[in-house]
């Protein structure tokens, strides 16, 4: 009987996780010319912050971004929009550095809402 309740609790904990993969696709990072400009949310863009642009997620959404080529991870906050693009996310330079893809320019990632 004790194992039954432990199993039920474990299933509840596992199924209650909101960190499911939201999206998979290509990531890039902002060019330096955007430093100091206003984002779509009204914030000033800074390359040294951990922020991102996404097509539709609400401003303030926090994401776990995983680089699929090297399994590195960064946590970012959405504060801007991507226009008509095949990319799923544009990252600040600091976020791209943490994911180790600056020299490549683009990388395949997964996005998880946190």
Placement of each model-derived feature along the sequence:
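Secreted/periplasmic proteins
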Residues: 2-114
